[in-house]
Amino acid sequence: LLVPTMSDERPVGTDVRRLSPRSIALSILLSCQRTDDALDELIEQRATSIPQPRDRSLVMELVYGTLRRQETIDWRLDAVLAKPLHKLPMVVQMLLRLGAYQLLFLDRIPASAAVNETVLLTKSYAKQLGRDWSGLVNGVLRNLIRVPAPPFPDPASYPAQSLSIRYGIPIW
C-alpha cells in the first residue's frame, strides 16, 4: 500500500508494512503537533500495525520520552544550532528532537545508530520538504555528542527556566 500524500504524516511513497518504529514515532509526534487528537488515540491507531512487542515499546518510549523531555531537548538543540530550532520546518524540528532524545536519554541505543537512523528518516522526507535536510540533522546530532551541555540556568536568578530545562516542565 503506497501512500502518496503528506496528510498521513508519512514520507511519500512509503510502504506502511515497512515503517520503522522511529518512522511511526515521528508520524505520531507530527500528528500530535498538528491535530487536537488525544495522544493515546494517535498511538493506538498507528502502533497496532507493529507486529513486534519490542518495536511497539520503542515507539511508545520515543513518543512519550520526546514529549516529556522536550524542554530539555530544545535547550540542548538550541545550543548547537546556528539558528533557533523553532525557525526550522516542523518535520525537521521533530526529527532533531527524536534523534536528540535517543542520544541524551536512551543509553541502550548506540549513538551511531541513533544518528544514522534519524538521518535516514530525514532523507525519506526530502521530497516533501523540498530539500534534503539530512546534512543539517547529521551535523547537529553529531555536535550534540561532541559538545558538552551548557550549564543550566541559575536557579536563584531564573527558577522557572531552570526547573523547566532540568526536568522538562513547560513554563506556564
Where are these regions (language model features)?
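Class I Rossmann-like S-adenosyl-L-methionine
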Residues: 2-172
